[in-house]
């Protein structure tokens, strides 16, 4: 995406009236994984709906282009993340979750713009690092994260289902440019 096109994307805090559009964009963005992880998809879809419907302590951001929401992300503070009724994972840094770009807006820098805003906000709060989780199915996202300077953080990995590894990544903000 050229600088001119990137500047046409406006990142802002989500509003209550954005909720339906956020859910539509998020589900559309993640729908491609339904066929690739059928045994896991139903639970993951429920998690997406619950997270978007009640972001809790997370900052919910949206990317707008031409007056339409074309991307969204959740930015959580450090916390203890519940993985199941018995398991949890300490997240020592702020965490990006559910980065989603409408399929029609992909390749235009929307995801990168949302990520840069998350980095900016964590830096403003004097955070030392930013974390996220992803899977090997999300190769495009993984390449973007690595270009931005994220590195593997295996201590944040977890296994929500047999054969499914959710990989942790971290961006050290003291080293990142």
Language-model features: locations:
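Short acidic N-proximal helix/loop "leader" segments that mark the beginning
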Residues: 1-4
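Extreme N-terminal starter segment of soluble prokaryotic enzymes
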Residues: 9-10
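Acetyl-CoA-dependent GNAT
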Residues: 13-19, 24-103, 115-117, 121, ...
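C-terminal "cap" of GNAT-fold acetyltransferases
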Residues: 28, 92-93, 128-131, 135-177
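Short coil/turn segments at beta-strand junctions that form active-site/ligand-binding loops
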Residues: 59, 126-128
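Conserved glycine-rich acetyl-CoA-binding loop
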Residues: 98-116, 125, 136-143, 147-148
């Amino acid at each position: 995406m050229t600088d001119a096109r990137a500047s046409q994307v406006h990142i802002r805090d989500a509003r209550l009236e954005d909720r339906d559009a956020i859910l539509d964009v998020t589900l559309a963005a993640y729908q491609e994984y339904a066929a690739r992880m059928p045994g896991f998809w139903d639970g993951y879809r429920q998690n997406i709906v619950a997270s978007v419907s009640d972001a809790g302590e997370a900052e919910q951001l949206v990317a707008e282009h031409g007056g339409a929401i074309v991307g969204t992300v959740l930015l959580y503070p450090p916390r203890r993340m519940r993985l199941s009724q018995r398991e949890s994972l300490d997240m020592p840094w702020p965490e990006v979750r559910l980065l989603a770009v409408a399929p029609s807006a992909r390749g235009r820098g929307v995801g990168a713009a949302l990520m840069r805003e998350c980095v900016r906000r964590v830096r403003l709060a004097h955070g030392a690092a930013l974390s996220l989780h992803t899977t090997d199915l999300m190769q495009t996202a993984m390449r973007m994260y690595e270009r931005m300077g994220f590195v593997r953080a295996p201590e944040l990995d977890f296994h929500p289902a047999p054969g499914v590894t959710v990989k942790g990544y971290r961006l050290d903000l003291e080293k990142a440019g």
